[in-house]
Amino acid sequence: MKVDLHVHSIVSKCSLNPKGLLEKFCIKKNIVPAICDHNKLTKLNFAIPGEEIATNSGEFIGLFLTEEIPANLDLYEALDRVREQGALIYLPHPFDLNRRRSLAKFNVLEEREFLKYVHVVEVFNSRCRSIEPNLKALEYAEKYDFAMAFGSDAHFIWEVGNAYIKFSELNIEKPDDLSPKEFLNLLKIKTDELLKAKSNLLKNPWKTRWHYGKLGSKYNIALYSKVVKNVRRKLNI
């Protein structure tokens, strides 16, 4: 089973992934997505419930959330609210400076207090325009012994599964069947495997990237933003 931990549905204003089509695609491709809409908790029976939460000092994702977290809270208040739910704190594209709310821009990633909250670091985001932000995330996760994960950051249906982790031992009918703690333990096992492959990634990232996922391009990202705005405006969504 493939797990893509960073997927947006049409609930995110920057996405064109209808829920029904998303479900059919994921079932066909044997993908369990984590739906991480911007500042909205979207619960779907085929997906891990998540939310990409904007705060006053960057953004992060809460996985296995039960309640929505409001946008633009103080960073630590938002982190506390996620932790109170027993959910996982996941750092998406933390070093991608092309993102307006990248955590690296707010100089919080090395704060001692912040480090106490983190469970998982996204070490491969397939929408990053270059390999460097992903390599920095990999080094950061290794430095602090955090679990590692991949996410496509899909905004279009054809992007879903561009980055994923394959769990041969994971076979669940509903993502709700899995507890956050159990899933984190599985990720830690996969993290050990990823570190063994790290040398190959560093030696030839442009070749190895196709094994881990597909990198986005600045042209695709520029195009998608225009397409999404035009389509949503015409459909009034």
UniProtKB/Swiss-Prot annotation:
Disulfide bridge positions per record: none
User: From which residue to which does the signal peptide run?
Assistant: none
Q: Name one Pfam family in it.
A: PHP_C
Checking SMART domains in the record gives: POLIIIAc
Read off the Gene3D superfamilies from this record: Metal-dependent hydrolases (3.20.20.140)
The protein's GO terms of the molecular function aspect are:
5'-3' DNA exonuclease activity; 5'-3' RNA exonuclease activity
Give the InterPro entries listed for this entry: PHP_domain, Pol/His_phosphatase_N, Pol/histidinol_Pase-like
User: What name does this protein carry?
Assistant: Uncharacterized protein MJ0417
What is the taxonomic lineage of the source species? Answer: Archaea, Methanobacteriati, Methanobacteriota, Methanomada group, Methanococci
